[in-house]
């Protein structure tokens, strides 16, 4: 059981300014090490993106090994589920390992650790068409081949037709899917 949860905000200063978007992402993640002062070496640390929500109801399945949360992956809202690949998101490990190996090691290797099945939710590209379009133009994959078709008009079509921004078809979320706890700020994303 988690006795105490500690949240700290870390500001990434002196961001890389080059053309490589991955260097910025990795730098920001590395800055998490600056927020560990006073955290015991045996504390559990979660390495996650902001749109990944671990299911704390499955925390009892943790052991003393680094563990990844396999997650339901929703696209645009809870209406659509992405099934193109399994999503292995949040990684949980001990603070000492986190400090020794660094956050990018765990994020880059999250598919290699033991995992808890369906232990959370990845809320990918939630928001209106303008917000999603802005994300697609600025995130680390923005310069990948084939991304030039991601105009605002196409993003609007992707959302209305249930098409992943890379072109694959999304499925309607099955009714039996376990959903995250309902928060009033998320009401517009429930169908």
Regions found by a protein language model. Name each.
Residues 1-6:
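Short, small-residue-biased leader/transition segments that mark boundaries at the very start
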Residues 9-13:
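Structured recognition/catalytic domains enriched at protein termini
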Residues 16-26, 44-47:
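Surface-exposed cleft-lining segments at the edges of enzyme active sites
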Residues 21, 25-37:
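Short, conserved alpha-helix that lines the donor NDP-sugar binding/gating region
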Residues 21-25, 52-150:
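Conserved catalytic core of nucleotide-sugar-dependent glycosyltransferases
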Residues 39-53, 59:
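Short beta-strand-to-loop acidic/aromatic patch adjacent to the donor-nucleotide binding site
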Residues 115-191:
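C-terminal accessory extensions appended to soluble enzyme cores
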